[in-house]
Structures are given as structure tokens and as C-alpha cells.
Amino acid sequence: MGGGGSALRVCADHRGGINWLSLSPDGQRLLTGSEDGTARLWSTADGQCCALLQGHESYVTFCQLEDEAAFTCSADCTIRRWDVLTGQCLQVYRGHTSIVNRILVANNQLFSSSYDRTARVWSVDKGQMSREFRGHRNCVLTLAYSAPWDLPSTPCAEEAAAGGLLVTGSTDGTAKVWQVASGCCHQTLRGHTGAVLCLVLDTPGHTAFTGSTDATIRAWDILSGEQLRVFREHRGSVICLELVNRLVYSGSADRTVKCWLADTGECVRTFTAHRRNVSALKYHAGTLFTGSGDACARAFDAQSGELRRVFRGHTFIINCIQVHGQVLYTASHDGALRLWDVRGLRGAPRPPPPMRSLSRLFSNKVGCAAAPLQPA
């Protein structure tokens, strides 16, 4: 079993559990959203809180950090945009009638999913709703976006995807593909027998991978709606997915992570050692980092599956992880953000250069190096 990791810093400013953690594209800041109804901005250079974002009237469910703005959504049915330098609220997006689950900023548009059974798209600058996507029979949990330039330039595809395609996953057991320009449902992806908890897009291959409470992952052609393959070896809900080149990593309630060949559905590796469900995944430079309901984060050699390090210190489930340079960031329902030294991990060689474009799902992939931190 791998040795323990040392904590560089513990940031315990939140007064409730942290539901999400986002890293800015330039790697300079982190954003946390909490059960205490606030979000906080943190510097990756020194781990200090640099802004408190207050205004939501209920807990913050999710957040996304861009270079010049922070976005948060909440159980108060709203989304907010914030200035990252001053912490001032710049815009409130109103229209959802229940908890907003997820948001995604892409192509100067803001996408959102909600318990009110809808997804919506908003003008980032004006705060106005552009489209409402109705058709799911239960709450919409997860979403991803494929821009027009990522789709094939055939006459049929061009007409359907002039404004790009939005893919949503719901507790009704389906995923849906929506034409952003028209608001029409392009395809309904049926096959799961449980809620769709997570999804990720391979945009060059116009393929969606969905994970479900039915313990399967399914691959779909988002243009035709065809189910391409089913990944069946998990014995519990599939909670999180990570797509790296032609490999799909899946974290499950069965306490394992599995690595699959995206093109065939073959399981080529299983990562064990977790004592509870696997709640978060992040691949970085040959190392697979995981967060678990057992309150530990772990680092595995992505190629061999060997456990390299265990990071102990949290007292509740780890909801989200990010990696930047030589630092691992973990956010937990115990209310703490922890920074860990990951120097000395000798992971497998880096995989081949990534495909032309991978849809960003709930996180920002950054390759910048963080300024060194001294242990607390």
C-alpha cells in the first residue's frame, strides 16, 4: 500500500461542506462553493482566501471559474456571476424554479441544469435566458456541450448543430441531445435502467459516455442517437467519469475505479483500495487521483494500477479534486479545502498528445506549474 501524503495547508474558512472546487484556466485561482451559501476564491500561489462571494440565499451546488469571472449556482434557484478581483456580484440569472444542479460556461454562453426538469442557456453578459430545453421527466443532473466547430461538416449535421449541441443526463434514466440554436430535442438516448449521474463528451468523435445508477457506462453517437457499446463490469452506481485520449476512467459506488478502452468497451484495469464509494477522479501526468467517501484521496500509477500514495486528513467524503503543478487540492463535505504535496510521484509516461478537442466537463484542465508552497 502506498505511503501517506503530507498536507501543505488546511483551509477551513467555510462553515459548511464544500460541494465543488474549480480551477481557473490560467491556474492562478481556485473557487469553492459551499453548503454555507458562500463561495470563496483562493490563490494557488499561497493558498490564501482572496475573496468571499456572498449573496446566495441557500447552499451553493456547483461553481465554475474562468480567468475574469466566477460562476456559482444554488439551491435558491439562481446562478450568479462574480468579479474575481473584487468579489462583487455582476449578474444574477433568474428563471429556474428549483435547485440548479450544474452550470457550464462555453462559447460565451451559460448552460444550466435543474431539479425543475429543464436545462437552460443564458447570455453571459446580458443575463437573459436564450433557450429553455424541456422534455426530461425528472430532474436534470449533468450536462456537456459540443461546439459547432467540433461537429462534422455534413449538410445534415450542420443544420442540426448550427449553435452546437447540448447533452443532458437525468434521473429519468435518459440522456438527451439538444440543438442549442432551436431548442429542439435532437436525440433521446435510451438504454439505461437507472438515473444518469455523469457524462463526458469525446467531441472529435461526437460520442457521449454516460454513467448510471444501473452500474453501466454507455457510449452513444450524439448525432444519430445510436447506442455504440455498453461497459458492464461495475457492481454499483457509476458516480464519475474521466476521459483521457482513448481511455475512459469510471469511479463507482462499488469502491473501485475502472479503466476502459473507449473504442471497444474492454475493461483493462481496476483500481482498488477505496473503503467507500469513489466520488471524484482526476488524471494528471500519468497519475490517477481519486477522492472517496472514506475521506481519503489516493494517487495511483495510471498504467500499472499501483497505489502510490494515500492522503489522509479529511473527516468526510471528498466531493471534488483538482491538480495544479505539484499540488493536489481536495474539497470535502467536512468544510475544508486541503492542499497536498504530490512531488515524488513517479507515474507512468504521459500518454500521446490529446485528441483535437475534449469537451470540458465541470472542471478545467490546466498544465501550468503552481508556485511552490511550504508545508503548514
Swiss-Prot record:
WD repeats lie at residues 13-52, 55-94, 95-132, 135-188, 191-232, 234-272, 274-310, 313-350. Transmembrane segments: none annotated. The keyword Transcription regulation does not apply. Pfam families: WD40 (PF00400). Keywords: Repeat, WD repeat. InterPro entries: G-protein_beta_WD-40_rep, Quinoprotein_ADH-like_sf, WD40/YVTN_repeat-like_dom_sf, WD40_repeat_CS, WD40_repeat_dom_sf, WD40_rpt, WDR86-like. Signal peptide: none annotated. This is WD repeat-containing protein 86. It comes from Homo sapiens (Human). The lineage of its organism: Eukaryota, Metazoa, Chordata, Craniata, Vertebrata.
